[in-house]
Amino acid sequence: MRILHINGYTDEERCDKIPEIYQNIHESMYQLVQHMAILGLQYQSIASRKCAEYILSLGDQAPEYINEDYCDHILTLWNDIGIRSCFERSNEFPLLDSTKYFLDNFERISDPDYIPSTEDILHSRKITTGIHQITFKVKVPRAMGGGVQEFRMYDVGGQRDQRNKWIQVFEGIQAVLFLISCGDFDQSLREDSRQNRLQEALNLFRSVWQNRFLASAGFIVFLNKRDVMERKIRAGKHIVDYFPDFEDFCNSPQEGNYFDESDWTKRFIQQKLIDITHETFKRNSRNNIDYSRRECYYHFTVATDTSCVRKVFNDVHQMILHQNIKQMGLL
């Protein structure tokens, strides 16, 4: 949103992101090295093993200063066959989605004059704690009435221990942008290794959809990391191994005989969300709000593709305009 609507980042702001990016890289390699022994994998060489010992000795926090020796250790490890094998099994342990991107680009990133690109910033990740507000104005298309619409967006922490804070911003919300990583269908939660990430997201969507404070809010669901999902399927991962009901879903009447597993996986995930919005649930006796007429849009997106997000924002305009017209009694 910042890139699209608030003039992006200054060079100073880009440089402020460098420690975050270095931490992402270090955390990724630290996790890979930690899980080599757990998965019973071997390093390609003694040199790689020594590099791994060095990374482990630093702990899970990146060093304050990235020197040449550190960079050599990271590059040696990323070129090691054993580490690559570990990466291929990363669905078995928590690992940042941006791991491959940053390690593939590490030589560029480790340059002393490095300034993060927009794509680097989009790939970086910092766990959100608390609630953060961003305010911006967007021109409303003439077809939707023209003028300028001010948006106040709240970024809330998604971890389980952060969710009790959400209620602070629920009242008066017109639209909920709910992000689900469809590429996480084969992974478990960091907080609970027994729980599938996608199933957790579906459960959370149900609780937010049914929240009485959001009864009049429209929903836009970003089914994000579509590219990650498609890459995993090409590599031989199958959602049916984690959601057995996918098999029955695929046995429903199909158009033609061609079966595209990526396409059907997307349909399956979206249908699970649609089913949730159609569920009946017990309402508080004091709550007379009609939940049945809310809008819910679904978009499969790639987080680093701003054109995807731009298209989605047309839905936000449409949704808020529709709500404003209803409030004026014209609908």
Feature map (PLM): residue ranges:
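Switch- and interface-adjacent substructures of P-loop NTPase systems
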Residues: R2-A217, K225-R294, T304-V309, M319-Q323, ...
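Conserved beta-strand scaffold positions in the cores of enzyme catalytic domains, especially
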Residues: Y297-F300
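Active-site neighborhood of phospho(di)ester-bond hydrolases with catalytic His/Asp-centered motifs
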Residues: F222
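Hydrophobic "lid"/C-terminal helical patch
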Residues: V316
